[in-house]
Amino acid sequence: MNALIGQLLNAPVALLKGATIALSFFSLYLFGLVIYRLIFHPLAQYPGPLLGRITNLYAAYHAWKGDIHEDIWRCHQKHGNCIRYAPDRLAFDTAKAVSDIYGYGGNVRKSQVYDTLVHRTANTLTMRDKKQHAQRRRIMSHGFSDAAIRSFEPRVQELIQTLCDLLIVKDASADSEWSAPQDMAPWFDYLTFDIMSSLIFSASYDTLRQEKYRSVIRAIEESNVRVSVLLQAPIVTLFRSDKKLFSQSILGRNHFTRFIGSTVKERVQKSKLLADRDIFSYFQSSKAAANGDSMNMNELSGEAATLIVAGSDTTATTLAATMFYLSQSADIYHRVAQEVRQCFNSEDEIHAGSQLNACRLLRACIDEALRMSPPAGSALWREVEAGGITVNGRFVPEGYDVGVGIYAVHHNPTVYPQPFRFDPDRWLVDDTHDVRSAFMPFSLGTRSCIGKGLAQMEALLTLANIIWRYDFRAVPGGAVQPEYKLKDHVTGAKTGPVLQYRRIVRDKIMIG
């Protein structure tokens, strides 16, 4: 009995010794890892933030904060054009690097971190295999052809008119009075969500006027906080830690996944009843050239989810940013208002085509807003393939990630003089090669945004309609901000601008 009691009393001591030994070995391992990454690692020669050179958790922290795009820019200001932003990652901020990494023929593929985002099956966002991606993109391209986009315009116009009608409540004020302040970020979120839902699924969720489905938009934003962290540090999923750290994001993801599942199911059920084609119908009817296969239900759902998120957010952020900069730049605002109002004699004339394309200053304002406040401003990481790659004159061996911080290169003064100045005229010079060479709000090359043409049409039509109908201004007395700030959580989380509107009266006929 005494021996048993002695063993029981000594057990905690033995456990403590074991834990101490294990902790010592673990500490020694961490110390060795830090020394290796700082001194002996193949990328040790490159400067960068100290914590970033040691651990991916540095980037993950800034992704969680939503300022990773600005932090990459700050690091470039301190360390130069090439920085080691994570132990196995190099970031650049030059036009040459944009071409080297994202241009056609670059010896890179999507980073392995995108595997972390795969849910059921890979989609065009997460596919790493170049051949598979090219095949899927060919299937999807039919839904974004010029002919398809032209056929979608009436639906887009109808929803834009709904937004314009809601910006000023009729009879709420005299013609010459300013409206109540409107936070435009949610308005543009509702508009673009309704547009993409209509164009993809022929669905009418009417978030512009009804609360019911607005929770889906909030769920997307919440879900993307976790996604942005995983893209920087997949290790966060170890022991399912992300489930505890990002419980709200998980709830948002589940809510959005259920929405997509039910929406796709409803869309499939009514396939034979639709008179007009939508993007989903193009996906259903298109087949891969290689084997004649069309997309299955999981693939259709995955692509639809990506399009809803990317298609809604990119355009909403573009619209909000452009309105912000116009409201802060009186001279430019008056010039673009004059351009739009002289170009169109009536609201009915505002359509996609040569007349709208003639509004060159309006288009330049959109491009400049995308330059200053890109919807996704951090780096799109690419893994170097066998044989390595030379980026901006520096050779990077196989297996490491390279990328260009979009916000950082968009604010590089060697490409864009006075980069924090809203200057749409930089896009109106005869030769725009230099400014275009580093411009990548929609990415570049084979991985560029497939819906770029649709997004540009939406932005031009929306802004032209608003400007033709209304004067607008920032709320008097508000603080003047030099830049439209975004939180980079894969997509751009945003607030504002808060604007007031006033109807334009033409020949005693009220517009609005």
From Swiss-Prot:
Induction: Expression is positively regulated by the oxaleimides biosynthesis cluster-specific transcription factor poxB. GO terms for cellular component: membrane. Gene3D superfamilies: Cytochrome P450. The chain crosses the membrane at residues 15-35. Heme binds at residue 449. Its EC number is 1.-.-.-. One of its GO terms (molecular function) is monooxygenase activity. Belongs to the cytochrome P450 family. This is Cytochrome P450 monooxygenase poxM. It comes from Penicillium oxalicum (strain 114-2 / CGMCC 5302). The gene is poxM.
